[in-house]
Every structure is written in C-alpha cells, then in structure tokens.
Amino acid sequence: MDATSPAQFLQVATDFVNDRMTGTLCASVSIPPRFRSQQPDAVERCLTDLRYGSVCINQWSGLAYGLVSPPWGGYPGATLDNVQSGIGNVHNTYLLDRVEKTVLEGPLVNFPRPVWFPSHSRSVDVATRLVQLYHRPSMFRLPGLFSAA
C-alpha cells in the first residue's frame, strides 16, 4: 500500500480492508495517541468509513463480543445472496435500534497485561480462579482473582 503520510496510509488501509477483504464482522485499528490528537479528522474518517459491525481501536476485536452488552454482528447491508458475516446482530443489551457498528476504544498500551494476551504469565491461574468464582460466587474470591490478573 503506497502512501506518503500516516493519514494517507490510514485511508488507503481503510479502503483496502473495505474493498479487498472478505467479511464485515470486526476490525481492529492501532492508533497511537499522538497521531489521534494530531490527525483527528483522519481517524474519524477511518471510523466512519470502515464497513464493519465492530471496530476496536487499540483493542482486540473479540473484546467487543466478550463484553456482551454492545451489539455484535456484521455491517448492515448483507443479503442472502452475499451474506458476508451475517445478517443482524446478537447481544445488544440496551436494545439499540438500527445499529450500524460498535466502536470500542482503549489505550494503545494496557496495564495490567490483558489475560487474553499469549504472553500473560498467569492466564491459567486467572482462568482457574474465574471458574471457581462462577462455581461458588463469593466476594472473598475476588481478591485472589484480581491479584492473579
């Protein structure tokens, strides 16, 4: 992808994924804070132009699904002849009408390291403590879960 500036690259990349990639379910975009503050129009244009049901800035796109409350589904416009990533959405806890997309934004660098990162050193411990909490809910299990995370 040829571009002479970061803002132009963002537009070229947006056009590429919209026009050349299959599916419309989710997209993740890494945007450094400095670029966001220096090029707010380019970032907003990217978010507006992306034809995906979920757009996550600096976050894993699966997080939009895992949160359960945001609407999750393919971008509107799919048909039975070209279903792409599906028709309609799931979750939508707040019963929002005619949702085009969910946009989720977080920091470029996360602390503590999210448990879904492959490099998280205690993900098995976190998962075990989370299952224990689900099995026998108790406020007393939370400190151990938080310390493992």
Which residue ranges define each predicted feature?
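C-terminal segments
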Residues: 4, 20-149
